[in-house]
Amino acid sequence: MVKLIASLLLLAVVAQAYGDFKCSLAVPEITKDWVDMKDACIKGMRNQIQEEINASYQYLAMGAYFSRDTVNRPGFAEHFFKAAKEEREHGSKLVEYLSMRGQLTEGVSDLINVPTVAKQEWTDGAAALSDALDLEIKVTKSIRKLIQTCENKPYNHYHLVDYLTGVYLEEQLHGQRELAGKLTTLKKMMDTNGELGEFLFDKTL
C-alpha cells in the first residue's frame, strides 16, 4: 500500500514537472498564397477519397466471402483482397495529395467514414465479378466528375487533373477491361462446365 501511494506521488510530481517545462511554440505566420485549391475541387477530392474507401470495404467483403470454408474459392479471395488493398492505397494517395497542397488543416476527422457494406454474399463467382465491374465503373465515373470539376474555370487545377488522368483514370480503364475479360471467360467456362468451370477458373486467379 505504501509503495502504491509512493508511486502515485512520484507520478504526480513527474506530470507537474512535464507541465511546467514542456515547450509551447506559436504557429509562425507565413504566406498562404501557395494554398490555392478551390472549395469545389477540395470537396470533390474528399468525396473521391470516400469512394475509394467504400470500394475497398466492398472488396474486403468479397474476399471474406470467398474465403469461407463453405465457399472455398482461394483464387477469388486473393483477387478481391488485392483489389481492396489497391483501393485503400488510392485513397491514401489522394490524402497525401491534399496534404501536399496544404488542404488538411481542418475537418480531418470527417475525411473518412467507415461505410456499411452493401452486399456480403454472392451466388457464384460470376455474380461477384459482375458486381466488381459495376463498382469500378462507379469509381471511374466519380473520377471523371472530379476531373471535370477541377479542370473547368475558375479552378483550372491542371496539375491535379493531369495526376488524376495520368494515374487514376488510366488504371481504372485498364482495370475495367481486365474485369470484363475475366467475367467473359468465367461465364463461358460456367456455361460449358457449370460449377466445375468456376472451380477451374478460380485456379487461374
Curated annotation (Swiss-Prot):
Keywords for the protein's UniProt record, in alphabetical order: Disulfide bond, Golgi apparatus, Iron, Iron storage, Metal-binding, Oxidoreductase, Secreted, Signal
Residues annotated for Fe cation 2 binding in this entry: E87, E136, Q172
Subcellular location: Golgi apparatus; Secreted
Tissue: Expressed in hemolymph and gut (at protein level). Expressed in the head (at protein level). Expressed in thorax and abdomen.
Pfam families, sorted: Ferritin (PF00210)
EC numbers: 1.16.3.1
Catalytic activity reported: 4 Fe(2+) + O2 + 4 H(+) = 4 Fe(3+) + 2 H2O
Biological processes per GO annotation: cell population proliferation; detoxification of iron ion; intracellular iron ion homeostasis; iron ion import across plasma membrane; post-embryonic development; response to fungus; sleep
Top enzyme class: oxidoreductase
Cellular component annotations (GO), alphabetically ordered: cytoplasm; extracellular region; ferritin complex; fusome; Golgi apparatus
Induction note: Up-regulated by iron-supplemented diet in the anterior part of the gut of third instar larvae and adults (at protein level). Up-regulated by iron-supplemented diet in the lymph gland.
Annotated ranges, domain Ferritin-like diiron: 35-190
Disulfide bonds: C41-C150
Gene disruption phenotype: Embryonic lethal with some embryos displaying cuticle and nervous system defects. RNAi-mediated knockdown is lethal at second-instar stage at 25 degrees Celsius and first-instar stage at 29 degrees Celsius. Reduces Fer2LCH protein levels. RNAi-mediated knockdown in the midgut causes a growth delay and most flies die at the larval or pupal stage; lethality is partially reduced on an iron supplemented diet and enhanced in presence of the iron chelator BPS. Few surviving adults have a smaller and shorter intestine.
Signal peptide: 1-19
Role: Stores iron in a soluble, non-toxic, readily available form. Important for iron homeostasis. Iron is taken up in the ferrous form and deposited as ferric hydroxides after oxidation. Ferritin is composed of a heavy (H) chain which is responsible for the oxidation and uptake of ferrous iron, and a light (L) chain which facilitates the nucleation of the ferrihydrite iron core. Required for dietary iron absorption in the midgut. Involved in tissue iron detoxification by exporting excess iron. Functions as an antioxidant and protects the developing organs from cell-mediated ferroptosis.
Subunit structure of this chain's protein: Oligomer of 12 light (L) chains and 12 heavy (H) chains; L and H chains are disulfide-linked. The functional molecule forms a roughly spherical shell with a diameter of 12 nm and contains a central cavity into which the insoluble ferric iron core is deposited.
PANTHER family found in the cross-reference section: FERRITIN
Family affiliation: Belongs to the ferritin family.
Protein name: Ferritin heavy chain
Organism this protein belongs to: Drosophila melanogaster
Lineage, uppermost ranks: Eukaryota, Metazoa, Ecdysozoa, Arthropoda, Hexapoda
